[in-house]
Amino acid sequence: YKSDSFYGLM
């Protein structure tokens, strides 16, 4: 999931 990587940065 694309957003999963986004949250990983957070």
Curated annotation (Swiss-Prot):
<comment type="function">
    <text>Tachykinins are active peptides which excite neurons, evoke behavioral responses, are potent vasodilators and secretagogues, and contract (directly or indirectly) many smooth muscles.</text>
</comment>
<dbReference type="GO" id="GO:0005576">
    <property type="term" value="C:extracellular region"/>
</dbReference>
<keyword id="KW-0964">Secreted</keyword>
<feature type="modified residue" description="Methionine amide">
    <location>
        <position position="10"/>
    </location>
</feature>
<comment type="similarity">
    <text>Belongs to the tachykinin family.</text>
</comment>
<keyword id="KW-0527">Neuropeptide</keyword>
<dbReference type="GO" id="GO:0007218">
    <property type="term" value="P:neuropeptide signaling pathway"/>
</dbReference>
<keyword id="KW-0027">Amidation</keyword>
<dbReference type="InterPro" id="IPR013055">
    <property type="entry name" value="Tachy_Neuro_lke_CS"/>
</dbReference>
<protein>
    <recommendedName>
        <fullName>Ranatachykinin-B</fullName>
    </recommendedName>
</protein>
